[in-house]
């Protein structure tokens, strides 16, 4: 054992010396290239003296980075993440200036702006060298990973996990590719955009679509997947009359309240309650290990900082610099892609200026890097269940469209992240079964504003006889709505100003993708159709007959074009009216109609089954949130050692690339049994956890290592026996193992 430790220490010393040598050479090269950076005195020095100065400066910079950087990042935890990323260059440059100041006799100096460049290059080169050495020395890398796992077991005092020498049951890693629909996944694999995922589908994985609820967006889907209930989540944002507040799924206070309601309704903490980790999600899933989780982001406790995930990542200066460089590159890429789309005259197109390039870079670079690093740390720690959300595709697809060159590049980078995670999984202290899934897809289409020249809010206000902007009033839709109001009120056109109701009756109009919500604060409770028509005689007719509107839901009644009406409580009526929106549309609408906080009027945009296009009520040319098209068909992809999501479905084992027959254009209806709703996905994931002898879902946090079952609830069935486990393919390079 002593000899092994000496060998390990010797290898570590050699790696440090090699990184130091490469950093020294890099500094010498930069001193020769950059005019404002020198490593010699004003009188000149010998080559030997210049070399010694570079050795001193490189060593001082490396030591300062290792000692000071974690403290600086911890002090900046409360700084907004975007600002923290931009400060990386300044902080690294400052450390270099300090290092140069430590050299005796003033033999080195650099202009501040040059110091930033030198520090960035040196950090990137040092990081690349360290990674290359780790790749070459597989044994040292593997020993380091197992040491990290042993440290975790020692910290837990052996109470948790598997005893030394015993094989741990396999863990479950759930990676959510936000917004990637089933058809997008199929094409990405067929077009070699995602070779890692395609390889899994050919050897050991299978994929199938599942159907979302009417509210096809992350808030509803992820709440259902992680907590088992998305009841009373009618949209991404909605108005609650009893409080007078607008709930927004990506607002921290709203997310915390939605999570509280789901826990209260289900009676358990969530999917990840025992030894789980939640990374980059809206909700915690009951996990103790959290990073970038919105529902707890308002907490400021020492043990659960809102941006603890950033500290775990940015405490390594090389990671910080690498991410900062990628951040800047992504901003430049977005600006160029936006200009290119404008020059080519691409249609449809939305504005991509303002802060959007920074927002996109944060989602596609910073959040991706932090989440991937956190997942790697979770695997090295051997956690039983991990759920992480990678949001890059969804963010880009909103502004570039679900299909195209921009999103193709994002899918390629997502595949590289998956490959990196799979490579690290091979060195984890336990095997991991990797499941990929998405929360929704995206449907393309020109925005409602771009197609008709006015927003849904403009149309509603015009239909209520309220003032609208001159631009909206001059559109055909606005003029028709205004005329309908006057006709309904039996007033001549010149008397339209008398038709304006008081301000207290103005509706609240909200948009969630191609789903619109209209609430009347002045009407207590849920407004009936008759009550709305008395207050605003032309509104419902104006909306239902608009070419950009597919249908309305008003108090148990579905309204379509040309006076079509279907009652939800009459069998078959809604199914016939909503048939163009796909199977299950009527049932999804019927479920939402039962929500306490459903809006007075729910508006789903028009949908073209031939093109799959919808009209978002927001400025998005790739949208989701309602019914129509690929937005309602996300995917679930699992290793075949796990049971089928639906035991009644037996896919053809010879089907190409492991894709499910549910995707066939003309499937056998006796064979296809689709998963419906996020709550059904939650049930499948719970079953897979049980199959791995993994965590159960308790009513409350476990006491004394055991979780009690709630009274009156059935005891979990024992896990099914058997099942051989396969390994996952290797790809990419190992991650820096210092990230925990």
What are these model-derived regions, one by one?
Residues 142-205, 450-451:
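Active-site-proximal N-terminal segment of extracellular/periplasmic enzymes that hydrolyze or transfer
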Residues 365-366, 370, 378, 386, ...:
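A long, amphipathic alpha-helix that forms part
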């Amino acid at each position: 054992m002593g000899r092994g430790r000496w060998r390990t220490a010797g290898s570590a010393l050699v790696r440090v010396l090699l990184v130091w040598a490469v950093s020294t050479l890099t500094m010498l090269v930069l001193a020769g290239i950059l005019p404002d950076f020198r490593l010699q005195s004003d009188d000149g020095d010998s080559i030997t003296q210049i070399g010694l100065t570079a050795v001193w400066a490189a060593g001082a910079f490396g030591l300062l980075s290792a000692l000071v950087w974690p403290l600086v990042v911890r002090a900046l935890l409360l700084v907004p993440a975007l600002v923290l990323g931009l400060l990386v260059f300044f902080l690294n440059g400052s450390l270099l200036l300090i290092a140069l100041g430590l050299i005796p006799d003033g033999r080195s100096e650099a202009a501040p702006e040059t110091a930033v460049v030198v520090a960035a290059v040196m950090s990137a080169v040092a990081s690349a060298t360290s990674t290359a050495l780790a790749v070459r020395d597989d044994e040292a890398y593997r020993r380091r990973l197992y040491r990290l796992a042993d440290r975790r077991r020692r910290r837990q005092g052996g109470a948790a996990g598997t005893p030394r020498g015993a094989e741990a049951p396999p863990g479950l890693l759930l990676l959510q590719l936000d917004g990637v629909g089933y058809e997008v996944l199929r094409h990405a694999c067929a077009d070699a955009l995602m070779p890692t995922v395609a390889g899994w589908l050919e050897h050991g994985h299978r994929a199938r679509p599942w159907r979302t609820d009417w509210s096809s967006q992350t808030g509803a889907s992820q709440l259902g997947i992680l907590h088992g209930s998305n009841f009373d989540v009618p949209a991404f944002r909605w108005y609650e009359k009893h409080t007078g507040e607008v709930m927004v799924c990506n607002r921290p206070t709203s997310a915390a309240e939605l999570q509280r309601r789901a826990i209260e309704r289900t009676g358990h903490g969530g999917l990840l309650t025992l030894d789980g980790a939640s990374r980059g999600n809206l909700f915690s899933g009951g996990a103790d290990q959290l990073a970038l989780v919105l529902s707890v982001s308002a907490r400021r406790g020492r043990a659960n900082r809102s941006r603890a995930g950033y500290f775990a990542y940015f405490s390594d200066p090389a990671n910080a610099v690498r991410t900062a460089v990628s951040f800047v590159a992504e901003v430049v890429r977005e600006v160029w892609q936006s200009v290119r789309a404008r020059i080519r005259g691409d249609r449809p197109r939305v504005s991509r200026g303002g802060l959007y390039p920074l927002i996109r870079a944060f989602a596609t670079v910073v959040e991706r890097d932090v989440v991937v690093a956190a997942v790697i740390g979770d695997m090295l720690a051997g956690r039983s269940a991990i759920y992480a959300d990678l949001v890059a595709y969804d963010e880009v697809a909103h502004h570039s469209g679900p299909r195209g060159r921009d999103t193709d590049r994002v899918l390629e980078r997502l595949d590289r992240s998956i490959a990196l995670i799979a490579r690290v999984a091979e060195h984890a202290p336990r095997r991991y079964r990797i499941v990929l899934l998405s929360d929704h897809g995206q449907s393309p289409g020109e925005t409602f504003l771009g197609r008709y020249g006015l927003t849904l809010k403009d149309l509603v206000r015009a239909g209520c006889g309220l003032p609208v902007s001159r631009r909206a009033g001059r559109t055909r839709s606005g003029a028709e709505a205004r005329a309908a109001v006057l006709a309904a009120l039996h007033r001549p056109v010149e008397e339209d100003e008398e038709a304006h109701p008081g301000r207290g009756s103005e509706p609240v109009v909200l948009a969630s993708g191609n789903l619109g919500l209209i609430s009347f604060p002045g009407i207590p409770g849920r407004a009936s159709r008759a009550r709305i028509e008395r207050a605003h005689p032309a509104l419902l007719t104006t909306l239902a007959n608009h070419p950009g509107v597919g249908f309305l839901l008003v108090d148990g009644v579905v309204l379509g074009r040309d006076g079509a009406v279907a009652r939800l409580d009459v069998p078959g009526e809604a199914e016939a009216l909503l048939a163009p929106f796909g199977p299950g549309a009527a049932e999804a609408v019927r479920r939402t109609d039962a929500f306490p906080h459903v809006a007075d009027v729910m508006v789903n945009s028009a949908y073209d089954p031939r093109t799959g296009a919808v009209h978002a009520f927001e400025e998005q040319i790739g949208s989701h949130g309602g019914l129509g098209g690929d937005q309602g068909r996300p995917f679930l992809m699992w290793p075949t050692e796990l049971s089928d999501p639906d035991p009644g479905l037996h896919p053809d084992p010879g089907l190409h690339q492991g894709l499910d027959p549910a995707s066939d254009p003309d499937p056998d209806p006796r064979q296809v049994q689709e998963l419906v709703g996020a709550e059904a996905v939650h049930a499948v994931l719970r079953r897979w956890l049980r199959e791995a002898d993994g965590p159960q879902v308790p009513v409350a946090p476990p006491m004394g290592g055991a979780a009690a079952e709630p009274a009156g609830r059935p005891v979990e069935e024992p896990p099914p026996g058997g099942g051989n486990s396969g390994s996952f393919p290797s790809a990419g390079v190992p991650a820096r193992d210092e990230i925990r």
